[in-house]
Amino acid sequence: MLLGVLCAIMGVIYMVLNMQNSSYLLMFNLFSTQSVNFNLALICDKVSTSFLVVVLLISSCVFLFANEYMSEDHYNIRFGWILISFVASMGILILSGSIFTLLLGWDGLGLTSFALIAYYDNYNASSSAFLTLMTNRLGDVLIIATFSVILVTGLTVHFPPYTLVWLSSILFTIASFTKSAQYPFSAWLPAAMAAPTPVSALVHSSTLVTAGIYLMIRCFMVDGAPAEMYSLMGLVGSITCLLGGSVALFEYDLKKVIALSTLSQLGVMMYSLSLNLPYLALLHLYGHAMFKAMLFLGAGLILMMSYGTQDLRLLGSLLYSSPIVISLLNISMLCLMGFPFVSSFYSKHLILEKMLDMNCNFFTSMMFMLGTLLTGMYSIRLMKFLCWGNNNNKPSYCNMSWQSKMSMFPLAALAVLSGQLMSYLDSSYMTFSWSTNQYNLILWGVLFLSIFFGIVMKFGNFYPTLMSSMMFLGPTSYNLLHYTKSLLIYMKRIDLSISEPNWVMSNLMYSSSWRVMSLFNWLTNYMLVTWFLLVWLMIMSILMW
C-alpha cells in the first residue's frame, strides 16, 4: 500500500516536471577538501521521476503477489524487509546526481541482491549469490576507478560530460556492462534464478539488470560518447542479444528461458545506445519492465500449480486448466516479440528502422537482426510448450486470488498501452525514421519469419546438449565461483557455529591469497582461442564502423 501511494505521488511530480520542463538538484554537503566538495546529490527531473514511477508500480505489484507466494514461508517478514531495502537502493541509484551517491545505491543493490538470491539455504543459491556479488564487485572497482580519474583531472564529482575524459568513459561503460549483464559479464543473470520468483520478477524487470542501462542513458543525456564507445557498445549489445536468443531457443527450464529473454532484450537496449538513441532505449526499458514483470508473475503462478516443476517438457495443456494465466503469458510473449500495437513495438521496431536508416556496422547489424529473429522463435516455442504441449505433470487447477489479479492485470494493461502512452506524455520519446518501404518490408519479414520458424521447427534432443549449456559463460562463472568456493565452506561452518572467528579468518586469508592468482591462470588453449576471436571481432568492428 505504501509503495502504491509513493508511486502515485511520484506520478504527480512527474506530470508537473513534464509540463514545466524543469529539473531540481538537491545537495547535502558532507565534507570538503581544498578543491573538491563531496556532496550527496539527488536529481529530480522527468527522467528520474518517470523511472521511479515504473519501479514503484512494479514493486507494489510484486509485493502484492509475494504476499501470497511466500505466505507459507517461515521467514517471510525478513524476506519483505530485504526486498524493501532492495527497492530503496534502486531508488537512491535512480535519483543519484553524483558518483558519491551512485556508489551508495550501487553497493546497496549488490548487498541486498546477494541476500535475496541466497535466501534459500542450498548450495545452488549460495554459489549463484556469490557469482552475482563478485560480478558486481568488479563494477564497484571500476566505478571507484572512474571516481579517482575524475578527481585527478580536476572535474566535479557530479556526472561530468561523457566525452571529457576518455579513460573515465571507458571505465564507466565497462562498469555498466557488469551491472546490465552484457557479454562477457552475463554469467550471473541465469544464475540469479535461484532466488524466489518475486525477486526474479523485480530483478529482471526494472531494478538490478536495468541499472547499468539507466546509468548510461543518464550520461548520454548530458553529452554523447566517444566514437570508439559506440562501436564497442554496438558489438557487445549485438553479441548479447544473439547469444541470449540462441541459448533460450534450446532451454527447457521455464525461469531460465525468461531470464535469457531478459539477456536478449538488454542487448537490444545497449544496441540502441550505440545508435545514440538514449530516449528510445529508455522507452524500450519501460515497456520491457512491464511485460517482463508480468511474465515472471505468470511463471510463479505456474510453479504454484505444478508444485515447483520448471521443466517445460513436463508442463503443457495449461490453456485448458488455467486460461487466464496463459492468456496473460501470451500477451507478454507478443510484447517480447515486438508484435504490432503492443508496448515494445513502438520501441523495438523503431530501433530496427533506425539501424537500417543509419550508417551502421554491417557485421553487428546482421548479428542484431539474427538475435531479433531468434526472439520470435523462442517466444513461439515457449507458447507451444505451455499451451499445446503434453501434460506430464497433472497440474492443479489455478483459482486466481484477488491478490494475483490485482498484481497482474495492471501490468497486462500497461504492457499493451505503455509504449503509446509514453509517446503521448512526452514528445522526447518520439523518434522519427525516414526509412524506405523496402526496409519496412524487411523488418516485417523478420517478424513473420520468426513466427513461422517457431511454429514449424521441431527441436531434437541433440541441440540442448550443445546450446543450452551456456558454454560461452563458462570462463567468468567458473573462475568467480572457484574464487568463492572456500567462502561457501567457511560460511557453512560459521552457520553451524563450530569454528572460532580467528581460525576462520586466518584460513580465509590464506586461501584467498592463492585464489586470486587462479583468476589470471585460467587461459587454457580452447579459451585462449575463444578470447582471441572475441578481441579480433572487436577490433574489426571498430575498424569497419
Swiss-Prot record:
Superkingdom of origin organism: Eukaryota
Keywords from UniProt, A to Z, are: Electron transport, Membrane, Mitochondrion, Mitochondrion inner membrane, NAD, Respiratory chain, Translocase, Transmembrane, Transmembrane helix, Transport, Ubiquinone
Localisation per UniProt entry: Mitochondrion inner membrane
What intrachain disulfides are recorded? Answer: none
What range does the record give for the signal peptide?
A: none
A single GO CC term for this protein reads: mitochondrial inner membrane
Q: Where are the transmembrane segments?
A: 1-21, 47-67, 79-99, 100-120, 141-161, 162-178, 195-217, 230-250, 263-283, 285-305, 322-342, 360-380, 406-426, 442-462, 525-545
Q: Which GO terms describe its biological process?
A: ATP synthesis coupled electron transport; electron transport coupled proton transport
Q: Does the keyword Lipid metabolism apply?
A: no
**Molecular function terms in GO for this entry?**
NADH dehydrogenase (ubiquinone) activity
What is the membrane topology here? Multi-pass membrane protein
Reaction equations catalysed: a ubiquinone + NADH + 5 H(+)(in) = a ubiquinol + NAD(+) + 4 H(+)(out)
The catalytic activity of this protein is classed by the Enzyme Commission as: 7.1.1.2
Does the keyword field hold Protein biosynthesis? no
Pfam families reported in the protein's UniProt record: Proton_antipo_M, Proton_antipo_N
Q: Which family does it belong to?
A: Belongs to the complex I subunit 5 family.
Q: What does this protein do?
A: Core subunit of the mitochondrial membrane respiratory chain NADH dehydrogenase (Complex I) that is believed to belong to the minimal assembly required for catalysis. Complex I functions in the transfer of electrons from NADH to the respiratory chain. The immediate electron acceptor for the enzyme is believed to be ubiquinone.
Descriptive protein name = NADH-ubiquinone oxidoreductase chain 5
Q: Which organism does this record belong to? A: Albinaria caerulea (Land snail)
